[in-house]
Amino acid sequence: MIVCIAEKPSVAKDIARIIGATTARDGYMEGNGYQVTWTFGHLCELKEPDDYTPMWKHWSLAALPMIPQRFGIKLINDEGIKKQFATIEKLMQAADSIINCGDAGQEGELIQRWVMQKAQAKCPVKRLWISSMTDEAIKQGFQELKDQGEYQSLYLAGLSRAIGDWILGMNATRLYTLKYGQNKQVLSIGRVQTPTLALIVNRQKEIDNFVSEPYWVLATIYRDTQFTATSGKFTSKEEGEKAFSTIAGKPFTVTDVSKKKGNEAPPHLYDLTSLQVDCNKKFAYSADITLKLIQSLYEKKYTTYPRVDTQFLTDDIYPKCPQILNGVSQAKIMSQQKYLPLIQQLATISKKLPKSKKVFDNSKVTDHHAIIPTGVPPTGLTDMEANVYDLIAKRFISVFYPDCKFSTTTVLGEVINEDGPKPEKIEFKVSGKEILEPGWRVVYAKDVKNADDDDASDNANGNADSGNGAKKEVVEERTLPSFTKGESGDHQPTLTEKWTTPPKYYTEATLLRAMETAGKFVEDEELRAALKENGIGRPSSRAGIIETLFKRHYIRRQRKNLMATPTGIELIDTIHEELLKSCELTGIWEKKLRDIEHKTYDPADFINGLKEQINKIVIDVLSDNSNRRVTIMTEEDLKKKPAAKKPAARKASAKKMPAKKKDEATAQNVDTQNAAAQPVSAPQAPADPMVGKPCPLCGKGVIIKGKTAYGCSNWKSGCQYRQPFSQML
């Protein structure tokens, strides 16, 4: 008998139907020589400290660091899990061979390997490796089963990650809780969660300590077109006024007119992070909600495997693309067959689909390709699922359209004052961008913003006035009047006072990008791709990391902004060990885990390195003779509304402002403080407006209210919708 083990019952039932195992048994399906069983995600976990020795049961500084001689696994203590494992164990011990049908990724490999180890399976094991759950993909996967040994390095990377997280998390959490905690509250420390928290805290401090400074911009209007001085901003009013007086009353002369044609390629296909970023920007979906939505679309066979970190396809997908587009053309989203005209128009542009290296590149794909539609026309989608599918479908269609062709016109001018002993000249510039052929942009013509507009306008490091570094110039799409070199005439100069502004608070979108690039803020897609190697966390785990920070009350959401709580700020201030809070160092560890997966780094070296680091951290913390304590915030604390007070840094900036600006700044400070002090959830009304609404995730159940979060009445059937009260601002 061949035993197949899937990661969840719904996947097992699909596989069983395809291979003919149609007889339902207790905990598995049977038929046609197969027995198809399943896990519920993780059935096993690494042992707890007290499973190794009773000395580690009670938290004690003297027992640190805790490092087992050999790490072991155990069943999760749950009656349902124990019952299902007993079924799996019985099937595996009698099996002639096993097919690992787990999720095709690092975590999926680890989940199934641990179950097989715990069940003491001795027979040969094959691996089903597929990128979508369509019937065709499952059938092809069973025809092309791999030897499990081909994925040994993937398993070792997952195992090293789990052990590394145990060593750092277990030891550092006990260490910091015992040394700096109070009131028996746990201070949770994690290899990825703590550097992520540090990003949010450091950004918040930059904002709190920011002192707004005035500057002046010189511009002039010539022929109803505003030109800006190329010399940049003036940091003193006197300098600006001097420049203004230099050009006042003097003629403006056009010195150069240049036109340059350019092409704008379609945006890359989606990986998980870029999809989460766009869903947060466009729909305000959290990273966790987006992951659940795309997972649901995958399990319904409408999109391909979601937990990916590549934006490319392999060459073998190209012949399937016409069929996929045909399926997408039949899709009805919100009762509209919106993709059919776009795909029909694509057929008029070229008889054969173009094949670009920017889309198809085997060297950029390891386990799975970018997220694309499967070609199965979706039905019965919730509004939230439809929004996510719409992004993926449009992105897939757009990559087969031609580049957008545009023309950029740059006009240079100058004003010369010859009244003094030495002529003074001030130069000006204006640029305009004209779309010649929209190309792929027609796919997004009805959208409020084009696909890449958000990336161009949203700089994670602040805005153009922040003074934090140069930004890539964004040329406004406008058609300039026809100018001729040498023409001259009157103009109207202006000197405008502006104020530098602080960096922006993180949103989930900008935080995900920062995690992806280990805290380095880049706009260029190619550079961003290179930095992914040193990103912190995996695409599939980043949403969970952010949710953990919410659950620990280290951060909270204020509209779309992520704000650190006093507990989160104090915890980061208390941690002096860079390994625990440095994105760069954590990113290096993350790269080593990828190297293990690629067979270029020894897992033993990774574990030994972490052991050395935790030893050093324990010694350093125990040597701290201060009496520092971290304030622990509870749910009730977050609901309290303390009196608003202005940060010192804001006062400093207000002092430099004129009366009107000062009033605005004061009002802004009060609003910010009041907003930060708002309760996490509003006082309960007699009838909660959320309760009873259709579930936005599965569409089958209705929203119910629990102790700490809203959920779905269909949770017993597997719906994972959960919206904590602390995120309902």
Residue ranges and their predicted role:
Residues 2-3, 118, 287-288, 309-729:
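Basic, low-complexity terminal or inter-domain segments flanking catalytic cores
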Residues 80, 93, 135-216, 220-222, ...:
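C-terminal or mid-to-C-terminal helical accessory/interaction module adjacent to the motor/catalytic core
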Residues 237-270, 276:
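Metal- or metallocofactor-binding catalytic centers and their adjacent structured scaffolds
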